[in-house]
Amino acid sequence: MSLLTLAIDVGGSSIKSIILRDDGTAASERSQIPTAHPATPDIIVSQLLDLINTQGDYDRIAIGFPSVVENGVTRGAINLHPDWDGFTLAEVLQNKLGKPIRIANDADVQGCGAIAGQGVELVVTLGTGFGSSLFLDGKLLPNLELGQHIFRDRDTYEDCLGQAALDRIGVEVWNIQLAEVIASLYKLFNFDKIYLGGGNSRLVNVDLSSNLSNKIAIVSNDLGLIGGLALWRSSGS
């Protein structure tokens, strides 16, 4: 029997949702609401419950969340609020909704929807922050979270390519820095493919060497929802 999955993508600027069939087709309209600020756990949980209650029938929930996630517990969501560190999000929502829930890092979820499952594949999400996920022959290496690592001098990847950087330096310089980051990541991971997603991927216009230009793909931000199905497929459920 086909199960319906309510897929939710929590971001620093918006929260998106859709109900999906097992084959990835939509069983509902896509919904989107602005992320409240301050984005404390109580406020975001309230937003999630309000959003979920507007959806139709579903059997289970998959959530992409902008932090490291360990067994349903969030670890350091710096683009939301410090109180998310150690918050038992899966348990809280499951107790309130009575539905099975799986939660993973949002870039990991988007990657699950983007990859081909061949070789070394790196996924980068460009939005409020800088998300990342890494796959080897289709197998996820979870919670990579490159965004908070130093790229150059004292600046992290997120310092160079997050929304605040884009607002400060403009799209032209932002693209120059993105090209430098991609070249650096290639030296680090020797990836076969890099997928660029997130809300700001629409602004990507980079000039790269010929050996890198054919390794880049721009992917739909909706893969942050569609990839949620993989959280259930991974267990054969």
Residue ranges of model-derived segments:
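Short glycine-rich, Thr/Ser-proximal phosphate-binding strand/loop in the N-terminal lobe
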Residues: 2-43, 136-167
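Glycine-rich phosphate-binding loop and adjoining helix at the ATP-binding site
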Residues: 29, 34-53, 57-61, 67-120, ...
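Short glycine-aspartate micro-motif
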Residues: 3-9, 60-62, 121-125, 195
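Glycine-rich phosphate-binding loop plus the immediately following alpha-helix
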Residues: 89-107, 140-177
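Short beta-strand scaffold segments in enzyme catalytic cores
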Residues: 15-19, 67, 112, 130-136, ...
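Glycine-rich phosphate-binding loops at beta-strand->alpha-helix junctions
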Residues: 14, 185-220
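A short, acidic, amphipathic alpha-helical segment used as a generic capping/interface helix at domain edges
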Residues: 174-188
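Glycine-rich beta-strand-to-loop/alpha-helix junction loops that act as flexible
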Residues: 61-67, 126-128, 193-201
